[in-house]
């Protein structure tokens, strides 16, 4: 089964990604150290209470400036307005839980 993570992004950054304008450097979020292993990231946008979409990452390029990897976006799935699954929040600090909604488990098969 493909590895999955949940990430939180700023609204402007998410829109740059879905418009194809932004490469993504996610060494700290990647659930693997192998740049050839694909993974899915479900995206929560700061200031909202819903998941916005899913990004499929596959492959990585070495970033000469940071020495880390710049993970390559292969496909972006966005959830239609009004049909987004709600995010789950920790009661203590209001941060999104890095879980994975069961509805989207089939995307990883």
What are the roles of these predicted feature ranges?
Residues 1-109:
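Structured alpha/beta reader/binder surfaces that contact nucleic acids or chromatin modification marks
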């Amino acid at each position: 089964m493909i590895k999955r993570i949940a990430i939180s992004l700023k609204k402007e950054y998410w829109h740059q990604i879905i418009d194809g304008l932004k490469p993504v450097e996610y060494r700290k979020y990647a659930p693997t150290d192998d740049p050839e292993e694909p993974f899915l990231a479900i995206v929560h946008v700061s200031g909202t209470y819903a998941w916005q979409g899913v990004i499929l990452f596959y492959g990585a390029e070495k970033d000469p400036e940071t020495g880390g990897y710049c993970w390559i976006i292969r496909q972006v799935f966005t959830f239609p307005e009004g049909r987004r699954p709600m995010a789950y929040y920790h009661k203590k600090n209001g941060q999104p839980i890095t879980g994975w909604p069961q509805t989207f488990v089939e995307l990883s098969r």
